[in-house]
Amino acid sequence: MSRVYVGNLDPRVTERELEDEFRAFGVVRSVWVARRPPGYAFLDFEDPRDARDAIRALDGKNGWRVEQSHNRGERGGGGRGGDRGGGGGGRGGRGGSDLKCYECGETGHFARECRNRGGTGRRRSKSRSRTPPRYRRSPSYGRRSYSPRARSPPPPRRRSPSPPPARGRSYSRSPPPYRAREEVPYANGNGLKERRRSRS
């Protein structure tokens, strides 16, 4: 069995997608995709020759870095690929020290077969995808136009025509009261009688 390291992966890639890509070159026994942190994965081929064919064909495709796994430390589990290259451990040899789960840290099974898997890793991936939408809905004020409405000018005010000035004299006035002829007194006191006589 031969282990292949795949780097520069899209964090959204799934195990099924990787398995579909690599199984065209041979039998893939297991696939493990890192989630904390994401960006790399390991695949175990049953035949080392199939692993080498996959490396030659897929290295550089989609920006991936595909190579044989050699001594990559405990975290990624890459260093165990060389130890298991000619062995027949597979899934039947669960008692071997090279079978270690990278999800729970226990030996005897792969991370793909871990019962504790799907807990923190999947929850975290769901929490990342639940980012609140940003400005998906356009605000209501954006649909309204703020152009001022055309207002018709107010109609001119009509002034009531003033009555024409009176051209003639008004006859509504009452005539002045009749004044009796004044009697002009004379020195002799008989002025009225003498006046009448003089007229006659």
UniProtKB/Swiss-Prot annotation:
Please report the stretch or stretches of sequence annotated as the RRM domain. 2-71
Question: Any idea which GO molecular function terms this record carries?
Answer: mRNA binding; zinc ion binding
Gly residues: bias regions? 84-96
Annotated region (Disordered) at 62-97, 112-200
ZnF CCHC-type residues are 99-116
GO cellular component terms, semicolon-separated: cytoplasm; nuclear speck; nucleolus; plasma membrane; spliceosomal complex
Q: What the entry says about post-translational processing? A: Extensively phosphorylated on serine residues in the RS domain. Phosphorylated by AFC2.
Phenotype when changing C101S: No effect on cellular localization
Q: Biased composition, Pro residues: where in the chain?
A: 151-166
Cross-referenced InterPro entries: Nucleotide-bd_a/b_plait_sf, RBD_domain_sf, RRM_dom, SRSF, Znf_CCHC, Znf_CCHC_sf
Tissue-specificity statement: Expressed in primary and lateral roots, stems, petioles, abaxial and adaxial epidermis cells, trichomes, unopened flowers, anther filaments, anthers, stigma, pollen, pollen tube, ovule funiculi, integuments, embryo sac and developing seeds.
Record's subcellular location: Nucleus speckle; Nucleus, Nucleolus; Nucleus, Nucleoplasm; Cytoplasm
Describe the family membership recorded for this protein in Swiss-Prot or TrEMBL.
Belongs to the splicing factor SR family. RSZ subfamily.
Report the function annotation for this chain.
Sequence-specific RNA-binding protein probably involved in pre-mRNA splicing. In vitro, can complement efficiently splicing-deficient mammalian SRSF7-depleted HeLa cell extract.
Protein's UniProt name: Serine/arginine-rich splicing factor RSZ22
Native organism: Arabidopsis thaliana
**Encoding gene, per UniProt annotation:** RSZ22
